[in-house]
């Protein structure tokens, strides 16, 4: 008996084929406008338009959402936004196909080394002038007892600046089997931009 009730619930093969043919023979429905979905009309059944004259607010609503596709004129590609975390600005007519002027590759999100090599400012190795004097300075041992220097790895955020795009924070660059200090950040692992003094 359970087999008979189970067979009664399922449609036969012929019924399924007829239903598919019936659905295919019907013309496709036009897509519903997005404005109705945004206002929560999806749960209401389709209503006939009223015969009352339209008010000015409904007329402006109907005209504000009209869309006329123009496939004959392709839009120009949008100019990418300048990444505020980059320590440089791109020239006006320059476009990098790898990163789209964001400084980071579109395909994998890693830094675009060609842009970093070309536009990133190099760290200033000698940031403060050194003055040599002939006299000896007195040494105060009490001042240095509590504060020991803090050693950090290259690329540590405590150094400030932006992570170097050439070495990606390691402070070193590789070429085949050779490893050298990064020419952009000089081994710091970060690009530290300082305001220009004039």
Swiss-Prot record:
Keywords: Acetylation, Cytoplasm, Isopeptide bond, Ubl conjugation. Its main location: cytoplasm. It is found in: Cytoplasm. The keyword Cytoplasm applies. There is a cross-link at residues 3, 18 (Glycyl lysine isopeptide (Lys-Gly) (interchain with G-Cter in ubiquitin)). Residues 1-23 have a biased composition (Basic and acidic residues). GO terms for cellular component: cytoplasm. The modification N-acetylserine is found at residue 2. Residues 1-86 are annotated as: Disordered. Residues 48-67 have a biased composition (Polar residues). Belongs to the HUA1 family. May be involved in assembly and disassembly of the actin cytoskeleton. This is Proline-rich protein HUA1. The gene is HUA1.
